[in-house]
Curated annotation (Swiss-Prot):
EC number: 3.7.1.14
PANTHER family xref list: HYDROLASE, PUTATIVE (AFU_ORTHOLOGUE AFUA_2G14860)-RELATED, MONOACYLGLYCEROL LIPASE
Organism listed in the record: Comamonas testosteroni (Pseudomonas testosteroni)
Gene name of the record: mhpC
Pathways per UniProt: Aromatic compound metabolism; 3-phenylpropanoate degradation
Subunit structure: Homodimer.
Family in the record: Belongs to the AB hydrolase superfamily. BphD family.
Name of the protein described by the UniProt record: 2-hydroxy-6-oxononadienedioate/2-hydroxy-6-oxononatrienedioate hydrolase
GO MF terms held by the record: 2-hydroxy-6-oxonona-2,4,7-trienedioate hydrolase activity; 2-hydroxy-6-oxonona-2,4-dienedioate hydrolase activity
Sequence ranges assigned to domain AB hydrolase-1 in this UniProt record: 36-271
GO CC terms in record: membrane
Source species taxonomy: Bacteria, Pseudomonadati, Pseudomonadota, Betaproteobacteria, Burkholderiales
Length: 286
């Protein structure tokens, strides 16, 4: 297998879906086999490659075609102001991307906002949904035990409103459990993504003013999702409360939960080796 990098796997597709007319989506595409689509979270500067570069190689080596999507309004994809809840629009973007790429069915891996998109996809397009792997997904309403929004979400919106290296570092400091992993390379890479398209940040805030995070809630429909699902959570997540994982496994017909100790909101990055082993076993045998 040749070495994977962002530039050699990069491509664009143009989709036409409700709310996303003649819309360019950027993705990284590598490998052959069953399709695994990885969906990133919603923080400023997020993108498919930066979210999943520690995962794409092992998945390709295991025999999967791996697609890392830049969600609408993020990184290299077109910018957008959304008039509907973001998880639903993002799900449509995945469906449109699959249509262009000729993919009939895919497994979905979703972190935070990407998890909300994966849940919406499974509800809207069940026949095109393989297995689901969710890491601290959004879109699950209030918590019985934790005041919301949590600290990390407050800092995320502060970064959207006041983008600077200082506000970025404030958010990253609660993003990961092990702060020694917050390297200058991580900070500068994220900051470069933020600076690349400031319209993304403005439009995210405009979208959030139209439809707040509470509008993303798909909890009442969790029982409709029949796909086999692996839910993972960082025990020390300061963005989305751990009890939401219990809500998922209590209400979805075929869901299991794995909690990573000493782990924040980015399990697939902070505990990449363990995450890769767990999720690849689930795809093969779960």
């Amino acid at each position: 297998m040749s070495e994977l990098n962002e530039s050699t796997t990069s491509k664009f597709v143009t989709i036409n879906e409700k709310g996303l007319s003649n819309f360019r989506i950027h993705l990284n595409d590598a490998g052959e086999g069953e399709a695994v689509i990885m969906l990133h979270g919603g923080g400023p500067g997020a993108g498919g490659w930066s979210n999943y570069y520690r995962n794409i190689g092992p998945f390709v080596k295991a025999g999967y075609r791996v697609i890392l999507q830049d969600a609408p309004g993020f990184n290299k994809s077109d910018t957008v102001v959304m008039d509907e809840q973001r998880g639903l629009v993002n799900a449509r973007s995945v469906k449109g991307m699959m249509d262009v790429l000729g993919i009939e069915k895919a497994h979905l891996v979703g972190n935070s906002m990407g998890g909300a998109g994966a849940l919406n996809f499974a509800l809207e397009y069940p026949e095109r949904t393989g297995k689901l792997i969710l890491m601290g997904p959004g879109g699950l309403g209030n918590s019985l035990f934790t005041a919301m929004p949590m600290e990390g979400i407050k800092l995320l919106f502060k970064l959207y409103a006041e983008p600077s290296l200082d506000t970025l570092k404030q958010m990253l400091n609660v993003f990961l459990f092990d702060q020694s992993l917050i390297t200058d390379e991580l900070v500068q890479g994220r900051w470069a993504n933020i600076q690349r398209n400031p319209e993304h940040l403005k439009n995210f805030l405009l979208s959030s003013q139209k439809l707040p995070l509470s509008s993303w809630n798909v909890s009442p429909r969790m029982g409709e999702i029949k796909a086999k699902t692996l839910v993972t959570w960082g025990r020390d997540d300061r963005f989305v409360p751990l009890d939401h994982g219990l809500k998922l496994v209590a209400n979805m017909p075929d869901a299991q939960l794995h909690v990573f100790p000493r782990c924040g909101h980015w399990a697939q990055w902070e505990h990449a080796d363990a995450f890769n082993r767990l999720t690849l076993d689930f795809l093969a045998n779960g």
